[in-house]
């Protein structure tokens, strides 16, 4: 499993607890110093958890990440205007970014069961950085967030749908009672906070 935008590791910690007894390898990607220090301590005795102190993008390099406070869940590569929420992303730090296709090859990863990605509007760039590996033949499930951060990054839900469907996925919205597979419609591009799951066609056929 890939946890992209791991923050302080709460999601991966939940997966670890729910998968006790199973042979699952977790790869966490967290570029900010404070969060990475936290997950380094939290998972220091875990043999099947690999921690990576960089972010995912479509190019290798460096960038500035903005946040309102350390370990904020709003940390973003886009300096968002959050005046409506009485918040200001007035702190920043420089971080490393990497394409994940190179990482997959370096670590000889053969298959990814699940990707959770929550990087405040930068999801499409991260998907592009997977190259040929962001494909339904290589990845089973992808959980991603959509909302106001996509407005700031100028990324539409339509672009995410098109990118994923072209690569063999069906896209479902997370609802209170489960997943609801939906065809894209323009009215869905309302930038209201929601979570989606892309499901590999081969998984759906099982």
Residues covered by each model-derived region:
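Phosphate/nucleotide-binding beta-alpha loop and adjacent structural elements of enzyme active sites
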Residues: 1-206
């Amino acid at each position: 499993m890939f946890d992209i935008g791991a923050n302080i590791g709460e999601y991966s910690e939940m997966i670890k607890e729910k998968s006790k007894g199973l042979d699952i390898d977790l790869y966490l990607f967290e570029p900010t110093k404070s969060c990475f220090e936290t997950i380094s301590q939290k998972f220091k005795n875990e043999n099947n958890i690999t921690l990576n102190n960089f972010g995912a993008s479509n190019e290798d390099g460096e960038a500035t990440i903005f946040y309102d406070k350390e370990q904020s869940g709003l940390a973003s590569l886009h300096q968002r205007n959050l005046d409506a929420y009485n918040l200001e992303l007035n702190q920043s730090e420089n971080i490393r970014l990497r394409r994940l296709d190179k990482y997959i090859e370096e670590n000889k990863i053969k298959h990814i069961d699940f990707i959770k990605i929550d990087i405040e509007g930068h999801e499409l760039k991260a998907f592009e950085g997977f190259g040929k590996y962001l494909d339904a033949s290589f990845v089973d499930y992808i959980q991603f967030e959509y909302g106001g951060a996509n407005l700031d990054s100028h990324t539409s839900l339509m672009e995410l749908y098109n990118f994923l469907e072209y690569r063999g996925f069906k896209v479902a919205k997370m609802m209170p009672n489960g997943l609801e597979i939906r065809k894209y419609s323009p009215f869905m591009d309302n930038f209201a906070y929601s979570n989606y799951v892309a499901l590999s066609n081969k998984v759906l056929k099982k």
